[in-house]
Structures are given as structure tokens and as C-alpha cells.
UniProtKB/Swiss-Prot annotation:
Keyword Ribonucleoprotein: yes
Pfam families recorded: Ribosomal_S10 (PF00338)
Name listed for the protein in its UniProt record: Small ribosomal subunit protein uS10m
PANTHER family: 30S RIBOSOMAL PROTEIN S10 FAMILY MEMBER (PTHR11700)
Amino acid sequence: MLRNTIALRSFIRTQSTRPYPVNVEAVYYAPLKLPIKYGDLVADIQLRSYDNENLDFYSDFILRTGYYLGIPLTGPKPLPTRRERWTVIKSPFVHAKSKENFERHTHKRLIRAWDTNPEVLQMLIAYITKHSMAGVGMKCNFFQRSEISLDLGSDANGLEKSLSNIDELYSLRNDDKAQTSAVGQKVLELLDSPDFKKHLEKK
């Protein structure tokens, strides 16, 4: 059906003598794409359909929409086709020998968006969802980058104290007597701690 539509457009274009507007003239050519500048991947748009013609038509529509919104897009990249087969009996009788095979192909396309503001990307998704085609499914994965912050909170003091104790023991590694005394002192502190004593209490 898509090939017939393209052939009909080409026939009408050759028969017409009027100049077309630029946006209408662009329909007869491949969709334009903006170059990738920073290489920042922001979204993956995966399309699925049982009919590859509608899938290619909708992919073309997404590329044109992204171009006019200023979004660099790559694709559509054909993904492996999923093939499913079922064998069922023709007769309602359970021991029937005649069987029938059914097969279904799921075609997939992948379009990637780059170097785009999240607000503009949401506008693209909203627009192509509003004008979606019947029989074509869409799944979008968003990628966002944020800073990593380390917040130890109340455990920071305990961690610093433990590190200071370890440093103190390593500083005494050449003095056996001082090291033995330091270790014994730490053992006594642990034995006198309330957390350790509560386990020694008889119930």
C-alpha cells in the first residue's frame, strides 16, 4: 500500500505544472536529519508492528517531526524480526490428525534521539503519540544524567573514629609492646560498652 501511495504521488507530481510549497515538496524526498553535535543519547524509540509498510511510514513521520523540532535523530534501524508459529488441530475432535499452522512476524524499528532538551523531547513524544497509527506500537526509554552525591549523615562520625583507630594501630606496628597495649585497651573498651554488656546479661 505504501508503494502504491508513493507511485501515485510521483504520478501526480509529474502531471502537475504548479509549483508546490517547500513543506509539501519535501514529502517527495527522504526526511532530513540534523547532525549529532555532542553525542548525548537522551532517548530510544522502539516501534513494533505486524505490518512493515505501516511501520516504515510511521518511522518516516517521526523523523520529519524530529527535524522540524530541532532534534537530531538516527535511524530507523531494523531490529531482528520476531517469528512465532503455532500448530493447532482443524477439527474440534481431540484425536484429529489434520492440523493447521499459523505464523506471525513482529517487525521492529529503532530510532534514537540525541542532544535534546527534556522538554522538547516530551513535546516530540506527545505529538507522535497524538498522531499515532493503528497497529503500530511504541516504547520509549529516556536517559537522564545527574550528579552523584555522597551523604553519610550520622555515620560519618563513627566512620572517622574507626579510621583514626586503624591509623593509630598502624602507627604502632613497629612497637610490639605498645601495639599489644593498644589492642588490649580497645578490647576493654568493647567489653565495657553497653551494647556488648546487654548480650552478657542472664535472662
